[in-house]
Amino acid sequence: MHRRTTTSISVTAFTLLLGATSVWAQANVSPDLTAALSTGSRSGNNSNSGDGSSSGTSTVDIVVQYKTAPTSAEYQTVTSLGGTLVTQYGAVKAAHYSVPKSAVQTLAANPNIAYMSLNRPVKGMLNITAATVHSNIAKSQYGLDGTGIGIAVIDSGIVSSLKDFGSRIVYSQNFIGSNATDQFGHGTHVAGILGANLPGGTYIGIAPNANLINLRVLDQNGASTDSAVIAAIDTAIQLSYTWKYNVRVINLSLGRPVFEPAAYDPLCQAVEQAWRAGIVVVVAAGNEGRDNSVGENGYGTINSPGNDPYVITVGAMKTEGTTTRTDDLIASYSSKGPTLYDHYVKPDLVAPGNLVVSTLPPGLTLSNQYPKNTVSGNYFTLSGTSMATPVVSGAAALLLQKNPKWTPDQVKARLMATATKNFPTSSIAVDATTGVSYVSYYDTYTVGAGYLDIQAAITGTQVASGSAVSPYINFNTTTGALSVSNVAGANVIWGSNVIWGSNAIWGSNVIWGSNVIWGSNVIWGSNVIWGSNVIWGSNVIWGSSVASPDLILDAEK
């Protein structure tokens, strides 16, 4: 688990934080890149990396976002400054460069550059599941199995030789190693939750006849970079225009800490581009829900790009080993909102993610390191929001099979509106390894709009007509009141005129701790578990530069 410290979002305060060191700063340059210009830590795509600057050299590995598509002249400018174009994207208006530190200030003066940041490290976030969310009924009663829908699995690759996938891995591309075959195990496990379909098999995926697009970005240790993930998203967008692949869903069971508002985060901007292209993007919330490093009890720990308001961000539930839903509880490690900087209400919903059995054959990094997690043969148990995410991606594929003309917003709204909203006030989980107990409260920052119910989503009749971007929270430091606000300029469906009722999205009885009930204006109780200066004040939580693997191998009791 990574540790976080507090720092200001402002450039001025960030400069002061560095003490006597003289640091040039500009609004379109990320604070961590500004700091790297004077520190000389290691490159973001080096095996020992912590950020995007080369130790002992004068170069930095960066991702540059442009306001309009970069031209050949802009690429040539980088070359003339001694830099190298590493990755040129197509649908995403960005580029990955390795440049001398001395060139950054010159590049930042280009009015077409929206934002420059380090090429940051990214890592993966680490049957009963299908029955719990009623996906088995989708096939038996409604004939829905994901047929014709392409799901892009941006992960550690897929072991395509497994019979569980048949011939449904229709495209493979590698963005980090020598080939697209999984060496870590995470991607194959995720793909199995999505679409495993071994004839006569026990472990069947949520959308067992969907086509899988295998885009490998995580190496044998589950590590990657922003640039690799952006390249994979860019490829998925371009493949979506080809009927052969029909990419309608992107699954991102990975992420990293949040460094800036979503409007500047390169991962967030890439997933928004996919969303605008008509692709439903489903992202893991993260597994930092137990983090109390700055006294916030796991709140404010949503990872990037799950902090983006457009995407569907997924938290993890525990099925308690049964197919009934009434005994299911939140996994205490599931990251909680609101998001850093923007204060978006996240996660959007929760799904089963604890002790999930799926495909993961012997001989891969995870199966070698944790042999006790092997169930039998090619099946393995993992827990985390990584495992909950493909459950929702599979659900999205089923909805799109039934409603092929639906937009990503309509899919997101239907899944949220029909999610189960009946929860206990709180629950206690015990870590199976350490024996430490964790208390979870079932507020909107923990469970979002509720617990995924695929049957309810399929049979629902509500169809959203506006944007389904997640709203953000305003905190009045004088009155202590919270209020939900829509994203500026968006025709958002969450307002008081929601077509299925003002309380249907999150429900009317979601409890904040023991004394605060959600509504349009709720009171910030005096015993709130984090101080106002941590999330809401001028000091915001700052994620560490090295992300820990969001993968829970020892699940909760």
Locate each region found by the language model.
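Subtilisin-like serine protease catalytic core
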Residues: 26, 54-57, 76, 111, ...
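Second-shell loop/turn segments in exported
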Residues: 59-67, 92-96, 139-140, 176-181, ...
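Substrate-binding/access-modulating region of protease and related hydrolase catalytic domains
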Residues: 72-76, 145-147, 197-200, 217-310, ...
